[in-house]
Amino acid sequence: MRRYFDATLPVPRIDIPTNSQISTQAAFGKILDDLAKGDSDLATRIMTTSPDVTGTTSLGPWVNRRKLFARTEKADAFIEQRIPSTAKWNFVPEGQHLELGIAEMNLFLLLGAAGLSHSLFGKRIIPIGTVYDTFVHRGLDALNYACYQDARFMIVGTPSGVTLAPEGGAHQSIATPL
């Protein structure tokens, strides 16, 4: 079987404020936003995706800077209709985020496939997916197969805990094994 390799990517300095307490979810968003501001090799290789939880898992600033992927350019309907929003959903061919809708199984299938890019095509992609941690179980078959194939990706389960009041009871982590 043919396998390719790609060089290790250098990681640029990431300035993380440590002078105050911050949630891991907010820190994750700040790290990606810091990377999105630059033009490092790492930042150009990151691909993010989520099953309809982009804003609530702190990917919003990354997506605003790096745009959403689409085969052809599409305008942001909220901007066109003058609907107030912190999201700037511009779809462009060079976009680095793929929005999946509510589809956790598709999230893990995509992460697994993109996580094999270095060995299949000789070019590394750094796939990062976010999901509400209580819904990870919806994609475990695909996650298992991706791991068997030695796919390289990052899955961020957030927000965790049992105090996510605005999201409702169905989004709590009470079923997550500890």
Can you say where each PLM-predicted feature lies in the sequence?
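Thiamine diphosphate
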Residues: 1-178
